[in-house]
Amino acid sequence: MGRWVRYIWFLFPALAIGQSDLDTTRYFKTYPEALTLRTSATLTGNSFVFRDLGNDIRYTLNPIRSTHFQTSLQFRALELGFGFSPGWLNPDRELEGSRLFNMDFRIYAGKWMQTFTYLDQEGFRADLDGTTFYFPSFGTRKVGGSTSYVVNPKFSFRSLFGQNEWQLQSAGSFVPRLLAYYTRYRANLGEGEDTLHTFDIGIGPGYHYNWVLHERWMLSAGNTTGLGISFLDSGPETTSYWLWETQFRATLAYNTDTFFAGVGGQYTFYEHAAGRDLRLDDRIYYLQFFVGYRFRAPDSWNAAAARINRTFGWD
């Protein structure tokens, strides 16, 4: 019972905080009384590139399932999304056991954005010398997130994600970010199951800009690049290496007060320097086409958020 009480109190500020009296500012518009539903068709995946520089060997493992549907729901500063991959969306669906599932959770608190991500995929393939090899028993599970801070109060970070805000005038901002991810690699090659674990932590500066092309159209682009450290646990021992990471993101969106749509993409690259000659590149990518609609949230939700605002002086 005590854990649930702490959990509810943790979420209260995120549910209540926002521009409750001023829905429209000079630079962006908010929808504090809206329940935002967003769905998308997404090409996504987490591929891995292994490079042996000393022996000039390179091969890439790509997930068998890469296309999936994703749905998210946002109210005020909370956003929850999940995605799944039906077999008919993927050309290699005849390979039993392959799967792709992901969940995303975001909290917006003032200038801060906290993200949590879960990505589980099973079944990979590799192309070597024109021949495709399948590894249905190779799977990865990635858990982690990032903490970002928006320096410029005129810039709307929410316009890029859940579309619970909309940029009215062009603005950009430096957005430094701290990230941490755990990845488990699992393979069964017929001689028992082998597992490998990595933990990545990094920090770096970023910059994002929202171009208002028209009152209903916006183009956004940005990049974050940083350094960190990666810990590799292979069972007998744990070693650490330098980590270099960079992320590119771009979105073109259309918006009305109720309906919105757009196309967006993101590419994240992690390079693990596992010694002088060995490299493990971890690539996370997606391209999505999304549509969404804003409903009026239940009056009880808005009333509860208003009471919390008044109680804690957040109005």
Describe the role of every protein-language-model region.
Residues 100-198, 266, 308, 315:
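Outer-membrane pore/translocation modules
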Residues 44-68, 79, 83-94:
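Surface-exposed strand-loop-strand hairpins of Gram-negative outer-membrane beta-barrel proteins
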Residues 20-26, 77, 109-111, 147-167, ...:
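Outer-membrane beta-barrel proteins
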Residues 102, 251-315:
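Predominantly the C-terminal beta-signal and adjacent terminal strand-loop region
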Residues 39, 69-75, 103-109, 145-151, ...:
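Residues on the lipid-exposed face of transmembrane beta-strands in outer-membrane beta-barrel proteins
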Residues 37-45, 73, 82-86, 107, ...:
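Transmembrane beta-barrel strands of outer-membrane/channel proteins
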Residues 31-37, 67, 76-78, 110-114, ...:
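Outer-envelope beta-barrel architecture signal
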